[in-house]
Design a protein with these regions (language model features):
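Conserved ABC ATPase "signature" region
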Residues: 98, 113-131
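A short, proline-enriched helix->beta-strand linker immediately N-terminal to the Walker B motif
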Residues: 154-158
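Conserved ABC transporter NBD signature motif
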Residues: 57-65, 74, 134
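ABC ATPase nucleotide-binding domains
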Residues: 230-251
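Helix-to-loop junction immediately C-terminal to a conserved catalytic motif
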Residues: 49
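Catalytic Walker B motif of ABC-type/P-loop ATPase nucleotide-binding domains
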Residues: 160-164, 169
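The feature captures the beta-strand-to-loop junction immediately N-terminal to the Walker
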Residues: 34-36
Length: 251
């Protein structure tokens, strides 16, 4: 099991933000995290990444408790790309991706063949070979997202956390990015708003509402008109496409 979470709870200013969150994700599985605005998706992502302390939780990566991993070792096992990742304007794509090797290097270490191989592999995974020398301020929104995901991949993590990476991208780039993400050889936990994207590309879904998990399972086993009505307060029809995926239409 790549990542397991048991009874995760978060309190901020004495208020329960997340309560009793539990789920598991297998190696190389893509897990979609869904829920309305304010349901706790970003808080859960940031807690898993170690940026917000949990009031209680057992979080393990490949059986190793996160609480026992030093920060540098944690960054070798888990990578996080937040919603609004940024970079210095004059850094090139290759410079940014190379920053992903920081957890594997100490000050004044020489750049190694292993570092180069990890960076090149990450660049190829996100199809950035033709953009290596382009600076950050010249990249489109989709190119910036791919660049930051490549940086995270250069960490060589077991688990990759992506907080709404397709927001503000047009449909073409949403689909392109989701195809690249789901082809990665790592476990991906990805926060999404689009139910159709989640149903098409994720093997498992976790539905959050008011800081609690209300459903978890494969898209075709949990996405129902009743669940959508209860969670997002909209009516929906669900059909199966000729490709075997779900198509959700809103009334």
């Amino acid at each position: 099991m790549a990542i397991s979470v048991e009874n995760l709870s978060v309190q901020l200013q004495s208020k329960d933000i997340l309560s009793g969150i539990s789920f598991r994700a297998a190696q190389s599985q893509t897990v979609g995290l869904l829920g309305p605005n304010g349901s706790g998706k970003s808080t859960l992502m940031r807690t898993l990444a170690g940026l917000i302390p949990a009031a209680s939780a057992s979080i393990c990566i490949s059986g190793d408790p996160l609480s026992e991993l030093p920060r540098r070792k944690l960054a070798r096992r888990l990578a996080f790309v937040p919603q609004h990742a940024d970079a210095e304007d004059e850094l090139t794509v290759r410079d940014i991706v190379a920053l992903g090797r920081t957890p594997h290097r100490r000050a004044f270490d020489f750049w190694t063949a292993e570092d180069s191989a990890a960076v090149n592999e990450a660049i190829a995974s996100m199809k950035l070979e033709n953009l290596l020398h382009r600076t950050w301020h010249r990249l489109s929104g989709g190119e910036r997202q791919r660049c930051h995901i490549a940086r995270a991949l250069a960490q060589k993590p077991d688990v990759l956390l992506l907080d709404e990476p397709v927001n503000h991208l047009d449909i073409e780039f949403q689909l392109e990015l989701m195809k690249l993400i789901t082809a990665l050889p790592v476990t991906v936990v990805i926060a999404l708003h689009d139910l159709n994207l989640a149903a098409k590309y994720c093997q498992q879904l976790i539905i959050l509402k008011q800081g609690k998990v209300i459903a978890t399972g494969s898209p075709d086993s949990i996405l129902t008109p009743e669940l959508i009505q209860n969670t997002w307060r909209v009516k929906a029809r669900i059909n199966q496409t000729a490709f075997g995926t779900l198509n959700i239409q809103y009334a």
